[in-house]
UniProtKB/Swiss-Prot annotation:
GO terms for biological process: DNA repair; DNA replication; regulation of chromatin organization. Residues 571-606 have a biased composition (Basic and acidic residues). This is FACT complex subunit SSRP1. One of its GO terms (molecular function) is nucleosome binding. The gene is ssrp1. Residues 460-693 are annotated as: Disordered. The keyword Oxidoreductase does not apply. Component of the FACT complex (also known as the DUF complex), a stable heterodimer of ssrp1 and supt16h. May also be a component of a ck2-spt16-ssrp1 complex which forms following UV irradiation, composed of ssrp1, supt16h, csnk2a1, csnk2a2 and csnk2b. The FACT complex may also interact with vcp. Component of the FACT complex, a general chromatin factor that acts to reorganize nucleosomes. The FACT complex is involved in multiple processes that require DNA as a template such as mRNA elongation, DNA replication and DNA repair. During transcription elongation the FACT complex acts as a histone chaperone that both destabilizes and restores nucleosomal structure. SUPFAM superfamilies: HMG-box (SSF47095), PH domain-like (SSF50729). Gene3D superfamilies: 2.30.29.150, High mobility group box domain, Pleckstrin-homology domain (PH domain)/Phosphotyrosine-binding domain (PTB), Structure-specific recognition protein (SSRP1). Belongs to the SSRP1 family.
Amino acid sequence: MADTLEFNDIYQEVKGSMNDGRLRLSRAGLMYKNNKTGKVENISAADIAEVVWRRVALGHGIKLLTNGGHVYKYDGFRETEYDKLFDYFKSHFSVELVEKDLCVKGWNWGSVRFGGQLLSFDIGDQPAFELPLSNVSQCTTGKNEVTLEFHQNDDSEVSLMEIRFYVPPTQDDGGDSVEAFAQNVLSKADVIQATGDAVCIFRELQCLTPRGRYDIRIYPTFLHLHGKTFDYKIPYTTVLRLFLLPHKDQRQMFFVISLDPPIKQGQTRYHFLILLFSKDEDMTLTLNMSEEEVERRFEGKLKKSMSGCLYEMVSRVMKALVNRKITVPGNFLGHSGSQCITCSYKASSGLLYPLERGFIYVHKPPVHIRFDEITCVNFARGTTTTRSFDFEIETKQGSQYTFSSIEREEYGKLFDFVNAKKLSIKNRGLKEGMKPAYDDYADSDEDQHDAYLERMKEEGKIRENADSDESGDETDESFNPGEEEEEVAEEFDSNPSASSSSADSDDDTDKKKDAKRAKIVKQKKPRKKPEAKKTKDPGAPKRPMSAYMLWLNASREKIKSENPGISITDLSKKAGEIWKNMSRDKKEEWDRRAEEAKRDYEKAMKEYNTSAPTEASKKEKKTKGEKKKAETSEKKKQKPSSPARAAPKLNSESFKSKEFVSSDDSSSDDSAQKKDSEEIASTPASSAESGSD
């Protein structure tokens, strides 16, 4: 037979809520780990007194009774696993697995039996139901009744609030049966009563959640928070974990108490109790117990009189009374040297602590995520700025936690930590390892090339050019003075028959067509294009490098070897720091090299400039010749459309600009054309006068 047995999907009932987990049996005993809370229960083999196998709602289950009276129940076994468990308990624990059935008659009368921490309601010899007395929060008595109230679990959809037992009076004069029943319940119940004096009291401690200042009274079985408005009583059995976390400023400390079930303030539930301490606060603590009692109860963990920092006193007392280890940050160190990362969760900023077995975020709202709950993590670029990134965690329950606005410098440290803990990284395939991913952030500085911005600028220039071309065409087409004057003549001219006669209509249409053709042939004045950037002559000497750049080129590989995986920006920063701290003697060598390079450059430039003018003059002549050709071609195109065709057209259109008349007078045409143009020029004046009359 195997030395160990393991069972998955085994359920444990916790105040009405069924939590799944993993059960492991070994020679040393039995261990159960709750998947939801991560809480581990250990039962040594020597403590197991009795084991019962029975049919339950979730298949089959076992009930273990220990020598100390504690009861543990685990459900979810299959019927076929009975033989395997029977042999294992018998061979390794020397205990027989007894099979017992529950009574299903549905009667509401029977006998009550108290055994260990259980109240069993039996009908005949079979139990109908069992109540864990540790779940009882209050017990009150009436004339013939006993009422039990129970602690509530927020995770259970249906909860048992209270139950009443009718206790019939007896004929015996031995005592009150109702009172005896209540005393049996109270002796094992988890009823919080401040009986006796507190072990110690911490005055006016600053509490972040729930917010306020509270006096904390430490009792043997529970913690009492007394504030100005609210009081809380926290049983030590509800404490899951303790955390002691240093603040980023290294002057304060967080002490975090994880609770299940949480404490309530109205409709608000607090799963974490967070205390904030200053490292400078000291105190001397004296326990309200004798030396012998302190030694017997705490076995050297505490002393009657202690002195030290306030946060150390609180954490030591809590650790001894709750009997839980205090979790502190592991070996993670951020970019600034602290053990936490500044980030934002939901609407508030706080601190994220990478621990050895999980992450914890403080303080609003506090979040604790264990590594075994995590499905994968994701490093995402920040939404508002590229100087930060987001860290996303997805859990097996389907929840997602996004910690945003993390400084870009923390990326490498956090990535290494996640890699070392072997957590699955969701976007690892998108980039080849850590360095390219980090370079994505490094290349997004404001002074780096932004392709998107350049593209948008180009599109804007093209749009502006298109708009200006369209507006130019529109103005050219709309500015047709002949057509406008024709409309005015038809409406206001005293003798419009000359322009509207049938004999001249055909000639007018032909002239208009000729004008349109001339317009198509006519070339627009070329718009001045922005001068292109002067292309640098590849044969020209290169500018000399500065002393720093000469040193950087020589030392780059050395810096890379000393800092493996360093990014381009970090390498530049590192080099700048080294150069800044370098002594003047070492810098003189590189200054001398820079001076030599400068002299060589000046010498090369003189030689280059002596040969350069000949080439420049050739280019200049070439460009001048091209300009002259363009001017002559423009004049040729403008000549045919200006005097000959414009004159007959403007006979009917009755318009001629003054500039056009002067240019025609100065031309070398014959005298007949001169007279025609002068007559045409005089026509608008007479028409204008008649129109004005």
